[in-house]
């Protein structure tokens, strides 16, 4: 069964009788009346087998169109359905059976409704042929730990929950200096003045059930400190000892350092032994005579992101994290932030800049993978 992906459309061109079938990114040309008739049926969402059964259909022309669309990854060729993590399988199967008998399960309908916008992203991942369902479903199995005390960390937490990463959590040491909700938290993930003074950690956990795309297990401890995250995300200035520990224990991590003036940064995403590390970044900056670490002049004012920039940075970071895990599911290595730092100017958010970091020959991380082999 082959069917076009949701979002593929038939476009007119300036040349009479000529059309484009696809998206603004990828498309095929339709230049005859016979092809147009077939393209209209395909654009309606009908499968190849359904159209083949129509009398008088040119099978060769139809196969040609589907083959061209498939080559551009504009076709879904596998049927799939949303699944929740293994601990819920029996519950969901029971709900599905009830729905077949005419019962309406509000929770299942809500999951399907909330998942549709997320599928508008995951179905277009390179190599996906099932409408993006497998990639979206797999997100709930990944453990992500966020550390940091700024707005970006808080917004990122909510975005990941809403995008299917049910197991995202804050590190135990997060908000140690600011355990209560304060004035700076107002407006972030629905926090209002009435929440000031409440426990930030407890508030975020109370939102987990409300924000999580997938259902949660009441018996599961999502704050289990003994479980090792698949990705650590640190927002703010980093501790060299902690980075060294993550490197030596082969823990993947993403850094979102504090902004410098009106310039924010995201990255790099470090895969120990397989990608450039933080020392590579410092050595490359030194070789290029760029500014490196700022001087420690004692007590300094804590710099918080403005709201607009905080949401922008958090959204970009969430996109990079989703790409990191979705790429693993599809066995491609297109992780965007590996070996890259993205800088964002508050005055021109629409023009972020990517800085590629190569592995530096003087950094020992290049030899870690060799020693592991």
Model-inferred region functions:
Residues 1-373:
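Adenine nucleotide-associated cytosolic modules
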